[in-house]
């Protein structure tokens, strides 16, 4: 698509990218033809519509649009119509129907029209042609005394007129014309060669124009008529042609046609003499007449032939209709239908050669045509069909063409011009022929009866062909390239060979070109053509006359002016020169016979001469022609490609300009409309948009909820439930649609009311303005009036004063002057009153006119505004309605598609789940069989061991018996000594093994004592810490006033640090967990104290507490990860069980309670899935915060160590480095940090160290502490979220061990808050032993009680009850183990199986254990070499719930395992 698409709502308005260079394939054309209702096999004549329609561009008012589902449709922005198919398809369907109707009606009445036209045109044509010829050839006066002899010419049989030797008629008739006016055939052939070149250039112009795509604007009536004629005339060309010629020859009346054709006969008196006239030196002016006439014919033909390709030159063509009529009218004479001179032997050969050349040229010409548009292809195909059909029907169509100039313009012009030339030949001869002509024509017209005449015609045809080929090489380069395609129409059909000779037609076609080519060929003809002296003289005269005619003819070559030039002025003098030589009364029968004999002799001589020259140069000319044709074909290809490329560029540029202009206009129009409407309808638009969005969102939500419900219940409901659901959806959609319609109507009503109110306000404001304007005008006029009156009064007073002064000076004249002045004053007052009255009337009239004008303008503005608002309202209503209906339809389609896809997906998933379930069941069965076989093997091995033990006891008893009887049986000592040694070896081996076991036990006991001593040391340290805490509490009480001064913003920034911490809260629980929580709580309170005092003492405590909290948070996250994994496993098992129940519920009878229970189960499962997703995101965030906090702690510690590095080495002796890890979950061991040290020792050592350290930089520590506060706050919120996502009520395991959980004080800091959840979840996770743990245990450590495993089962059963409120039939009813059904094994069953086989440690467990020990050894070495790492291990976890191993390094740096 071109340009950026425009979005209207959720619809995308696209632009069509029209490709001018696209050429559809034939298969695409056939498919499109079938789409618009064309049968390509039965209706090939309508295929041009398919070729045109498949590449037709989209109309301007139509635009392609795309909805949100991706479907493309077409929308008419003019009338609001939309459709799925291309708008041009319907248009071309109607065109197909119209064309089919035209073809059917024209085919039905064509035969009737032919007969009627023949009779009607006999009466119509003579007066028309006489008028036309009289107007164009007025100076020509021909006597009409030869009408009686012409009447006898009609009596000749039709075979003489339509035979292949019918040309002899013209030659024999011409032999006695105009008192022996004869000329050489070579001269006539030269002229024919010239006309051939002229016709070629005409065809070139026509082809080029059709290729440029200008043929799209041709006259449709003419094209339809030519198509009909070509279709109906192509079935039986030979038979129709013979019959039409016979009919024309038998029915024509020469008396009527002679009156109209005699001016044309004088005009073309030399045209037929070119073919068969002997040399007559006494008449040199006839060649000039012939050339001028041929040029006139060419010009007329150019003017008429350019119409199919250039409709814009119709005005030039209309300006000269008389020329066309003059050239067309003589075609009505049927006697000269085919005046070609060739024999039966030579004509087929030349026709084949010309046909080959024409086919090659046609192929070359068709290649670029295929690249043009479909309109150009249709026009070119139509023109080719017209040429062929008219060539077969030229005698038949001559009457209609002569009588109807409009049909003449629509048809091809080359054939009509040739017919006119032949008819003119016979018409010219008709006045000079009598009965002798008739007698001479009858034997010459029948080719089977007169062999001698056929031989003469053969010689004549050879001569004509020889001269043609001799004269064709010097043709101009353009004319040689253009003439073969033009003559192809006559050479293409072999059935016309016997009737019309193609070479003569080529020669006559070539006579229709411009005068420039004619003069050039005349000069070349003088140089190359070997002809008698008379012919040369005539050629020179003809060349001179052609040069005189040159300017007029060159004007005709120009495509813009070729019709406007009249050919009659150069023709008239030549025709006048022939007037006194054609009186038919002076000719006698003897003269005619003498002329015939002379003509026969001259013809024989010329034929022999031409045969010899033809045989010599035929091969050379053919080679030259082939070479030139190839060159011209290449040149034509290049020219046509260039023209096509330039046309494409112009069309593309025009399209782009038009698109840009349309976009600009549309944008201007839209911007104008927006600017006009925005001010008045912004609020309403927002309200409507909000309502629409709300309704659409509500509709979408309802649809989504319905889709989810359908997805959930798709597999458990049958067709009846689906139909019911569809009905409910339709009802809801109808209700929503009604609601939308109501909302839309409401919005429109509001908009209408607002517009009415605005209109009233505008009217009121306009009236107020008008009234104000009137008042202002009145006041201004009154003010002016008052000023005028006051000025007049002042003038009067001044005049009175002057008069009084004069009266005082001149007492004698006072009375007289007073009378005069009083009279003048009265006149002045009267004049002033009249002037004021007129002025007042004018002002009032002007006021009234202005008021009327303003009222009219106001009414116009109101009407215009009312119309604009109404149009805008209608437009918005239509847009909203269309948008809503389109949205509803789109949602319905999307809903149906989504339903179908969901149905298919559910079906596929169900199949996959069933297949997986079958595979899992098969695997579980295999595992059960494997376990059974392993159990059997173990039992067998145990039985074997018992048997071996029994045999060992018996052997020992036997050995004792042998020792008692040693003295008695000394002779057997040697035999039994060996047995005794073997027994002793076995005994020693057993003793050694027992000793090793004792040593291991002693080592474990020693380790236990060490650990107890460490515990005592830790208790002592805890007491010391308690004392230190009391001192710190005293200091905290002293600094209470500082804590009260902390601002509200700091409290909000760190809400989890609260200063009111009491030591009694820390003393409520004992043990290691108590120590952790106390230290962490104290670290939080000490951090608050540090923020005020910034003492290094508090910083070390802050660092210690944060380290403990960090490790606790890590452990909590690890426990949460394990819990989440278990919940995920249980969720997967529950989902599998739910799917199984759903499938069983569908297979069994429908029961709504069961379906409702399954729906509740599904909701619970979805809720659990959401909770797990939230837990994942929260844990991810917690991990990130832990990393940040650890980095900050490391930075703080490194800064502290840098401050203390210059104080000397660390005081105190570190205790032994050790690592303690929990074996309850070996899978997540690698992800945990094994750096756990003893915080009390570390804090005590740091306390001892801190006393001697100087104060730190407050700014750096304050920044790090502030970042730690923020991270701790975020981490607390994340851990609280994780705590809230877990089950609220702890499992029974937590109730059985209350002493081990620290109390949670609501006033304590949030850091211990997640310690409680940590303890709860650590206890929960530690209650689930795995096979790896039992492999480590190997029976030495304390066993977990059965209540622990039972607690895990209870917890999982509680989960199952939450997922399945209706009950768990698998757990309550099925006696099979849980592993076979739910995909996991219960803790009790794991304990039972693992205790049974604890002696056999798997290889994988040992390998994992060895790898872990090796990694821990390397880590211990790294810790030993790093002095900055913490020195003490963390306190052990409660022994009642955890089975712990401790790794340590002995004096040889080897790892030793201590279990406790």
Curated annotation (Swiss-Prot):
Tissue specificity field: Expressed in several cell lines.
All copies of domain WW, residue ranges:
56-89
**Modified how:** Phosphorylation at Ser-186 is induced upon DNA-damage caused by treatment with IR irradiation, UV irradiation, hydroxyurea or amphidicolin. Also MDC1-mediated chromatin remodeling is critical for DNA damage-induced phosphorylation.
Q: Where in the cell is it found?
A: Cytoplasm, Cytoskeleton, Microtubule organizing center, Centrosome, Centriole; Nucleus
Q: What is the effect of changing residue 186 to A?
A: Prevents phosphorylation
Which residues are recorded with the post-translational modification Phosphoserine? 186, 201, 566, 1386, 1388, 1443
Q: Give the signal peptide, or none.
A: none
Q: Could you name the Gene Ontology cellular component terms for this entry?
A: centriole; centrosome; ciliary transition fiber; cytosol; extracellular space; intracellular membrane-bounded organelle; nucleoplasm
**What GO terms in the biological process aspect are recorded for it?**
cell division; cilium assembly; DNA repair
Spell out the Basic residues composition-biased ranges: 109-119
Keywords attached to this Swiss-Prot or TrEMBL record, sorted alphabetically, are: Cell cycle, Cell division, Ciliopathy, Cilium biogenesis/degradation, Coiled coil, Cytoplasm, Cytoskeleton, Disease variant, DNA damage, DNA repair, Mitosis, Nephronophthisis, Nucleus, Phosphoprotein
Q: Where is this region: Disordered?
A: 107-135, 213-412, 440-593, 658-719, 1290-1310
Top-rank lineage group of the source organism: Eukaryota
Q: Where is the composition biased (Low complexity)?
A: 285-296, 453-464, 514-525
Q: Where is this chain primarily localised?
A: cytoplasm
Which ranges are annotated Basic and acidic residues under compositional bias?
256-270, 310-323, 357-367, 465-481, 537-546, 658-668, 686-719
According to the UniProt entry, the coiled-coil residues are 1154-1206
Q: Where is the composition biased (Acidic residues)?
A: 217-227
Q: Does the keyword Transferase apply?
A: no
In residue numbers, the region (Interaction with ATRIP) covers 1-194
List the InterPro entries hit by this protein, alphabetically.
Answer: MT-Golgi_org_protein, WW_dom, WW_dom_sf
| PANTHER family membership | CENTROSOMAL PROTEIN OF 164 KDA, NUCLEAR MITOTIC APPARATUS PROTEIN 1-RELATED
Summarizing the function annotation, the protein's role is: Plays a role in microtubule organization and/or maintenance for the formation of primary cilia (PC), a microtubule-based structure that protrudes from the surface of epithelial cells. Plays a critical role in G2/M checkpoint and nuclear divisions. A key player in the DNA damage-activated ATR/ATM signaling cascade since it is required for the proper phosphorylation of H2AX, RPA, CHEK2 and CHEK1. Plays a critical role in chromosome segregation, acting as a mediator required for the maintenance of genomic stability through modulation of MDC1, RPA and CHEK1.
Associated disease = Nephronophthisis 15: An autosomal recessive disorder characterized by the association of nephronophthisis with Leber congenital amaurosis and retinal degeneration, often resulting in blindness during childhood. Additional features include seizures, cerebellar vermis hypoplasia, facial dysmorphism, bronchiectasis and liver failure. Nephronophthisis is a chronic tubulo-interstitial nephritis that progresses to end-stage renal failure.
Give the quaternary structure: Interacts (via N-terminus) with ATRIP. Interacts with ATM, ATR and MDC1. Interacts with XPA (via N-terminus) upon UV irradiation. Interacts with CEP83, CCDC92, TTBK2, DVL3, NPHP3 and weakly with NPHP4. Interacts with DZIP1.
The protein depicted here goes by the name: Centrosomal protein of 164 kDa
| Organism annotation | Homo sapiens (Human)
């Amino acid at each position: 698509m071109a340009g950026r698409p425009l979005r209207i709502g959720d619809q995308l308005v696209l632009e069509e990218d029209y490709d001018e260079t696209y050429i559809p394939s034939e298969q695409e054309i056939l498919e499109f033809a079938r789409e618009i209702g064309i049968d390509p096999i039965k209706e090939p004549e309508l295929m041009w519509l398919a070729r045109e329609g498949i590449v037709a561009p989209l109309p301007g008012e139509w635009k392609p649009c795309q909805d949100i589902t991706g479907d493309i449709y077409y929308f008419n922005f003019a009338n609001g119509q939309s459709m799925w198919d291309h708008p041009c398809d319907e248009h071309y369907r109607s065109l197909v129907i119209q064309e089919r109707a035209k073809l059917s009606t024209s085919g039905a009445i064509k035969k009737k029209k032919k007969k009627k036209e023949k009779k009607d045109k006999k009466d119509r044509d003579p007066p028309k042609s006489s008028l036309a010829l009289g107007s164009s050839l007025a100076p020509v006066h021909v006597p009409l005394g030869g009408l009686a002899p012409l009447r006898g010419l009609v009596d000749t049989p039709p075979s003489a007129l339509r035979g292949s030797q019918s040309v002899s008629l013209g030659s024999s008739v011409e032999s006695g014309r105009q008192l022996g006016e004869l000329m050489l055939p070579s001269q006539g052939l030269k002229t024919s060669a010239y006309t051939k070149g002229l016709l070629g250039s005409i065809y070139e112009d026509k082809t080029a124009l059709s290729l440029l795509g200008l043929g799209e604007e041709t006259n449709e009536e003419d094209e339809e008529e030519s198509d009909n004629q070509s279709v109906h005339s192509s079935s039986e060309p030979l038979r129709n042609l013979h019959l039409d010629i016979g009919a024309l020859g038998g029915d024509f009346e020469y008396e009527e046609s002679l009156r109209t054709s005699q001016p044309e006969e004088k005009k073309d008196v030399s045209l037929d003499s070119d073919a068969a006239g002997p040399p007559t030196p006494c008449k040199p002016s006839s060649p000039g007449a012939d050339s001028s006439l041929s040029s006139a014919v060419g010009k007329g033909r150019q003017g008429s032939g350019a119409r199919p390709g250039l409709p814009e030159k119709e005005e030039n063509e209309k300006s000269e209709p008389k020329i066309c009529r003059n050239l067309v009218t003589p075609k009505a004479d049927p006697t000269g239908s085919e005046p070609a001179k060739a024999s039966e032997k030579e004509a087929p050969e030349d026709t084949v050669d010309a046909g080959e050349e024409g086919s090659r040229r046609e192929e070359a010409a068709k290649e670029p045509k295929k690249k043009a548009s479909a309109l150009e292809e249709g026009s070119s195909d139509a023109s080719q069909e017209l040429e062929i059909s008219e060539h077969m029907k030229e005698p038949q169509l001559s009457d209609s063409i002569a009588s109807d100039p409009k049909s003449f313009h629509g048809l091809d012009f080359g054939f009509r011009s040739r017919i006119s030339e032949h008819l003119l030949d016979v018409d010219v001869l008709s006045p000079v022929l009598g009965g002798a002509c008739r007698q001479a024509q009858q034997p010459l017209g029948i080719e089977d009866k007169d062999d001698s005449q056929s031989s003469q015609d053969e010689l004549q045809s050879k001569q004509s062909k020889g001269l043609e080929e001799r004269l064709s090489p010097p043709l101009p380069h353009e004319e040689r390239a253009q003439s073969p395609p033009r003559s192809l129409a006559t050479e293409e059909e072999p059935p016309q060979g016997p009737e019309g000779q193609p070479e003569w037609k080529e020669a006559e076609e070539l006579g229709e070109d411009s005068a420039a080519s004619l003069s050039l060929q005349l000069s070349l003809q003088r140089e190359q053509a070997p002809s008698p002296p008379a012919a040369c003289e005539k050629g020179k005269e003809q060349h001179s006359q052609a040069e005189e005619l040159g300017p007029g003819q060159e004007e005709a070559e120009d495509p813009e002016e070729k019709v406007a030039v009249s050919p009659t002025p150069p023709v008239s003098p030549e025709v006048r020169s022939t007037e006194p030589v054609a009186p038919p009364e002076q000719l006698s029968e003897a003269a005619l016979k003498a002329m015939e004999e002379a003509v026969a002799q001259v013809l024989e001589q010329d034929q022999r001469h031409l045969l010899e020259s033809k045989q010599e140069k035929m091969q050379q000319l053919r080679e030259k022609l082939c070479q030139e044709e190839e060159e011209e074909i290449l040149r034509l290809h290049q020219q046509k490609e260039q023209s096509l490329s330039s046309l494409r560029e112009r069309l593309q540029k025009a399209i782009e300009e038009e698109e840009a202009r349309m976009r600009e206009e549309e944008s201007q129009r839209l911007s104008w409309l927006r600017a006009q409407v925005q001010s008045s309808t912004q609020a309403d638009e927002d309200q409507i948009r909000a309502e629409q969005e709300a309704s659409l969102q509500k509709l979408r939500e309802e649809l989504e909820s319905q889709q989810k419900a359908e997805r959930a219940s798709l597999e458990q409901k049958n067709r009846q439930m689906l139909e019911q659901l569809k009905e409910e959806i339709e009802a809801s959609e109808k209700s929503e649609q009604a609601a939308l319609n109501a909302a839309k109507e409401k919005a429109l009503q509001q908009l209408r009311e607002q517009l009415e109110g605005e209109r009233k306000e505008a009217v009121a404001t306009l009236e107020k303005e008008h009234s104000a304007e009137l008042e202002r005008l009145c006041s201004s006029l009154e003010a002016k009036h008052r000023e005028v009156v006051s000025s007049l009064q002042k003038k009067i007073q001044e005049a009175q004063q002057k008069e009084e002064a004069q009266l005082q000076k001149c007492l004698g004249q006072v009375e007289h002057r007073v009378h005069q002045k009083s009279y003048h004053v009265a006149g002045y007052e009267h004049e002033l009153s009249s002037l004021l009255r007129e002025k007042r009337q004018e002002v009032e009239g002007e006021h009234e006119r202005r008021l009327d004008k303003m009222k009219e303008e106001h009414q116009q503005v109101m009407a215009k505004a009312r119309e604009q608002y109404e149009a805008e309202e209608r437009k918005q209503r239509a847009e909203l309605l269309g948008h809503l209906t389109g949205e509803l339809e789109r949602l319905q389609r999307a809903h149906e598609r989504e339903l179908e896809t969901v149905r298919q997906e559910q079906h596929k998933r169900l199949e996959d789940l069933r297949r997986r379930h079958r595979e899992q069941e098969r695997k579980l069965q295999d595992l059960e069989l494997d376990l059974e076989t392993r159990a059997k093997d173990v039992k067998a091995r145990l039985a074997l061991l018992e048997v071996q033990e029994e045999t060992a006891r018996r052997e020992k008893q036997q050995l004792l018996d042998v020792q008692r009887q040693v003295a008695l049986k000394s002779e057997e000592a040697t035999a039994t000594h060996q047995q005794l040694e073997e027994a002793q070896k076995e005994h020693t081996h057993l003793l050694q093994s027992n000793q090793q076991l004792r040593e291991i036990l002693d080592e474990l006991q020693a380790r236990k004592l060490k650990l107890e001593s460490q515990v005592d040391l830790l208790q002592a340290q805890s007491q010391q810490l308690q004392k230190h805490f009391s001192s710190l509490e005293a200091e905290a009480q002293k600094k209470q006033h500082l804590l009260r001064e902390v601002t509200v913003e700091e409290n909000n920034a760190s809400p989890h640090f609260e200063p009111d911490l009491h030591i009694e809260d820390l003393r409520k629980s004992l043990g290691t967990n108590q120590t952790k929580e106390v230290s962490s709580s104290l670290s939080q309170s000490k951090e608050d104290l540090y923020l005020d005092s910034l003492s290094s003492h508090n910083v070390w405590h802050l660092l210690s507490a944060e380290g403990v909290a960090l490790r606790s948070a890590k452990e909590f996250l690890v426990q949460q990860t394990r819990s989440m994994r278990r919940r995920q496993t249980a969720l997967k098992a529950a989902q599998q069980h739910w799917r199984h129940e759903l499938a069983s519920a569908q297979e069994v009878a429908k029961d709504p309670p069961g379906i409702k229970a399954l729906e509740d189960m599904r909701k619970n499962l979805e809720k659990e899935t959401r909770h797990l997703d939230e837990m994942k995101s929260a844990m991810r965030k917690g991990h990130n915060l832990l990393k940040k906090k650890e980095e900050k702690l490391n930075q703080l510690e490194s800064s502290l160590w840098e401050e203390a590095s210059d104080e000397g080495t660390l005081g105190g002796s570190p205790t032994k480095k050790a690592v303690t890890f929990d074996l309850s979950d070996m899978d997540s061991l690698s992800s945990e940090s094994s750096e756990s040290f003893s915080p009390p020792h570390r804090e005590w050592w740091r306390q001892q160290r801190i006393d001697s350290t100087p104060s730190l930089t407050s700014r750096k520590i304050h920044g790090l502490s502030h970042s730690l506060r923020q991270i701790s706050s975020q981490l607390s919120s994340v851990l609280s979220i994780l705590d809230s996502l877990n089950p609220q009520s702890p499992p029974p395991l937590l109730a059985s061990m209350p002493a081990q959980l620290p109390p949670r004080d609501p006033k304590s800091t949030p850091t211990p808050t997640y310690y409680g959840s940590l303890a709860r979840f650590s206890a929960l996770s530690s209650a689930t032993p795995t096979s790896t743990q039992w492999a480590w245990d190997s029976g030495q450590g304390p066993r977990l009680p059965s209540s622990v495993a039972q607690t895990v089962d209870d917890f999982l059963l509680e989960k199952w009850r939450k997922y399945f409120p209706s009950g768990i039939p698998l757990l309550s009813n099925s006696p099979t183990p849980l592993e076979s059904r739910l995909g996991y094994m219960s803790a009790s069953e794991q304990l039972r199986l693992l205790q049974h086989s604890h002696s056999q440690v798997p290889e994988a467990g040992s390998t994992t254990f060895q790898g872990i020990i090796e990694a821990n050894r390397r880590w211990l070495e790294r810790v030993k070499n790093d002095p900055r790492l913490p020195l003490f291990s963390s306190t052990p976890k409660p022994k009642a719930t955890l089975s712990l191993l401790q790794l340590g390094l002995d004096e040889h740096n080897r790892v030793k395992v201590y279990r406790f």
